[in-house]
């Protein structure tokens, strides 16, 4: 890895940042992180306004950035430094002018945030750099010394695209926010459609990539979807209408069809939303309403994910551009399994453009595979979820396995989504699906009922838990009643969706198999907890919704405090797990975050109070502190607020608030709906495996690294710190230095780096 001196005897290293191509929510978070991380590391950031057009124009379009220039932009959509198409940059003369203007400012390092077109143009510019310098020296536009000082152009690309169409990265900046817009719209359309028993055709973006239509179809519970990677077969009109009719017969009151703006049939002929509506009317005589979502998908406030992940990418981009792994290769920093990953820029661009060629060649399986494993899995899941039971390949029989679903522990948004997915996917396997009302107490009271395909209609959109959930862990005295209920209802397996108390309940129950043999059945634990404190799961169902709820509340707290000089101390849930606190701190722009994991001392609080006062003396108007609800037995929210108030001496006031149960409420986020669906699909696969092998084992599953892992419950304490009720391994703690770097201005210093993984292949 080449080591670059951040400062020279005369001036600091200068880093340019620009946004190019279509705007995407989260670009501002990335720009903010680049600017502030560069300053924290002693480099000088420059904003190149309006993308490459600003570089071609030069002068005032290349602006030196200060810490305050990046203030107040984290929660804004679009890009505050602008983006524009630049035909001039496509020509050599335009790139030549851009090179001159960058050299005039002393910039030879660029963080470029854009799509594949912007990034490929950037790579062409990089390969020409030496030629531009030579010609500029010959023209007398720059000196030989300037050319020698900037012999090489360093490039790091960040992918900004709401379509999520870059091969090699799980997510692109803006995709999660766009999915939020679409799913919100589907939820709202579904309610009016159900009222009138109507059919809606919803057109979403995704000219060449089916991520948005496919994921919104799964998360929104759509009946039919058209994606570029899986073009419609001949006779699609009749198949679609049959699917919708059978769905209505099975209990649906509304029909939702999702179509990508780039959808085609297998001959490459475009299929528009109007084509679909016309085909529906020809075969049913009924009108289908058309809603084209358009640019609402691109605008508005970024989601929590697009804030914290874009901040992470911006931080890592500065780290990479100052110490490039290979200075001769332009790289993209993408995301794989929530880890920053280094990807060769041009190879990623070629692979991305190659998907279009695969579609044209009719190799649709390869086109889907290029989108990643999660995409191909979700294609199959969507087919199963949307297929009415009368069209299912495995209708339930008298000898069908009876699988019961139970919720336990604290409420987590997405529990209903998990139950819906379990019922419909289980029925597709030919099983009889049962619901247990009222958690373990309900099972003991024999509150067990069969759940049919239409019983769970609409559950995907709802917060709460239709089956109910309770926190108490059953005692040994209740085991007999639980065992009798399992036997009486002929339950062959249990799907337990819940939090840590659910895990502990299963652990304790299965330790008594000799005395209570009824518990000797396959049991799969599915993680659902806003605390994100469960073993063997990097993210639990409900965590993303809680994070978005918290960030929404913190945004409003900041607005309320902005009218006067104020410090606000906000308390978040999580018990002794600081995930919500740290991630909401990064996503909301908090200055301080206090976590149970860090054992804050009184001396540190005293130092923080002095620094807080100094910032207000320097002109600050707002200061946000986030604290975990169990950060410390003594140094809690009220204590911190009192200390900061005592230090203020009237310079500013201090308010505190516990965000409370709003973090548990509301409809589950798109991510939580998709996570719940994927985990349930994997859980049913585990049950299928146990049934076929004659095994009866209690296990817990979760997304870890690049796969959903299955682990035995009897080894659970290998992963779990029971004293603090959280996992030993908490991946998100590696992000702690980022909050420090981008939230509080200080003297340039060494920053603890984040780990940047190297992509070994494009299979992810």
Locate the predicted segments by residue.
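C-terminal non-catalytic interaction/assembly regions of soluble proteins
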Residues: 272-397, 641-764
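Short glycine-rich or small-residue beta-strand-to-loop segments that form or flank ligand, phosphate
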Residues: 14-22, 79-84, 108-114, 157, ...
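Glycine-rich oxoanion-binding loops at beta->alpha junctions
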Residues: 2-8, 56-110, 119, 145, ...
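Short glycine/serine/threonine-rich phosphate/pyrophosphate-binding segments
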Residues: 24-34, 55-56, 91-96, 116-124, ...
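Short, ordered loop/turn segments at secondary-structure junctions
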Residues: 20-23, 48-54, 85-86, 115-118, ...
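Accessory alpha-helical/coil subdomains and C-terminal extensions
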Residues: 45, 112-114, 120-154, 172-290, ...
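N-terminal phosphate-binding or glycine-rich loops at protein starts, especially the Walker A/P-loop
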Residues: 2-59, 397-444
């Amino acid at each position: 890895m080449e080591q670059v001196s951040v400062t020279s005897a005369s001036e600091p290293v200068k880093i340019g940042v620009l946004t190019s191509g279509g705007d995407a929510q989260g670009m501002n978070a990335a720009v903010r992180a680049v600017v502030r991380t560069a300053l924290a590391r002693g480099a000088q950031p420059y904003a190149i306004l309006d993308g490459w057009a600003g570089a071609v124009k030069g002068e005032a379009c290349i602006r030196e950035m200060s810490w305050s220039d990046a203030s107040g932009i984290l929660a804004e959509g679009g890009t505050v430094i602008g983006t524009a198409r630049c035909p001039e940059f496509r020509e050599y003369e335009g790139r030549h002018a851009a090179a001159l203007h960058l050299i005039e400012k002393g910039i030879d390092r660029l963080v470029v945030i854009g799509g594949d077109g912007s990034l490929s143009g950037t790579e062409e510019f990089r390969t020409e750099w030496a030629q531009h310098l030579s010609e500029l020296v010959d023209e007398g536009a720059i000196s030989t010394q300037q050319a020698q000082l900037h012999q090489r152009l360093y490039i790091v690309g960040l992918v900004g695209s709401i379509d999520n169409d870059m091969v090699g990265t799980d997510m692109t900046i803006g995709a999660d926010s766009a999915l939020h817009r679409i799913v919100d719209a589907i939820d709202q359309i579904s309610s009016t459609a159900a009222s009138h028993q109507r059919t809606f055709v919803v057109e979403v973006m995704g000219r060449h990539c089916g991520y948005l239509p496919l994921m919104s179809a799964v998360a929104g519970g759509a009946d039919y979807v058209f994606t570029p990677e899986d073009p419609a077969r001949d006779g699609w009109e009749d198949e679609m209408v049959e699917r919708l009719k059978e769905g209505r017969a099975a209990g649906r009151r509304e029909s939702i069809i999702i179509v990508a703006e780039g959808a085609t049939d297998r001959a490459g002929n475009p299929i528009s939303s109007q084509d679909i509506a016309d085909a529906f009317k020809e075969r049913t005589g009924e009108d289908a309403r058309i809603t084209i979502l358009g640019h609402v998908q691109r605008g508005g406030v970024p989601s929590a994910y697009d804030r914290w992940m874009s901040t992470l990418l911006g931080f890592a981009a500065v780290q990479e551009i100052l110490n490039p792994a290979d200075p001769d290769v332009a790289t993209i920093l993408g995301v794989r399994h929530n880890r920053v990953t280094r990807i060769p820029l041009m190879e990623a661009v070629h692979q991305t453009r190659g998907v279009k060629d695969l579609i044209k060649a009719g190799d649709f399986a390869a086109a889907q595979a290029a989108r990643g494993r999660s995409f191909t899995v979700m294609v199959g899941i969507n087919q199963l979820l949307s297929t009415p039971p009368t069209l299912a390949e495995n209708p339930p029989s008298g000898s069908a396995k009876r699988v019961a679903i139970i919720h336990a522990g604290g409420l987590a948004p997405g529990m209903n989504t998990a139950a819906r997915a379990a019922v419909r996917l289980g029925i597709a396997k030919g099983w009889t699906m049962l619901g247990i009302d009222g958690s373990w107490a309900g099972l003991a009271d024999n509150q067990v009922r069969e759940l049919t395909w239409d019983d769970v209609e609409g559950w995907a959109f709802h917060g709460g838990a239709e089956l109910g959930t309770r926190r108490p862990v059953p005692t040994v005295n209740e085991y007999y009643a639980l065992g009798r209920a399992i036997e009486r209802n002929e339950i062959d397996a249990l799907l337990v969706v819940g939090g840590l108390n659910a895990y502990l309940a299963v652990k304790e129950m299965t330790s008594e198999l000799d005395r209570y043999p009824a518990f000797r059945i396959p049991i799969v634990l599915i993680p659902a907890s806003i605390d994100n404190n469960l073993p063997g799961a990097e993210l639990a169902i409900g965590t993303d919704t809680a994070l978005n709820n918290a960030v929404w509340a913190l945004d409003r707290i900041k607005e309320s405090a902005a009218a006067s000089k104020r410090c606000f101390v906000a308390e978040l849930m999580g018990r002794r797990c600081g995930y919500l606190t740290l991630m909401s701190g990064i996503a909301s722009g908090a200055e301080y975050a206090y976590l149970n994991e860090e054992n804050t001392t009184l001396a540190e609080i005293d130092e923080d109070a002095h620094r807080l006062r100094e910032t207000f003396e320097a002109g600050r108007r707002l200061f946000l502190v986030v604290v975990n609800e169990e950060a410390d037995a003594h140094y809690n929210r009220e204590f911190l607020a009192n200390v900061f108030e005592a230090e203020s001496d009237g310079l500013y006031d201090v308010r505190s608030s516990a965000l409370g149960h709003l973090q548990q409420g509301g409809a589950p986020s798109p991510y939580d709906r998709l996570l719940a669906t994927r985990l349930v699909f994997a859980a049913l696969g585990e049950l299928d495996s146990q049934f076929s092998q004659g095994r009866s084992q209690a296990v817990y599953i979760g997304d870890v690294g690049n796969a959903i892992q299955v682990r035995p419950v009897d080894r659970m304490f290998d992963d779990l710190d029971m004293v603090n009720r959280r996992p030993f391994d908490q991946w998100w703690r590696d992000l702690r230095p980022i909050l420090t770097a981008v939230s509080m201005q200080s003297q340039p210093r060494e920053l603890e780096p984040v780990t940047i993984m190297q992509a070994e292949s494009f299979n992810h």
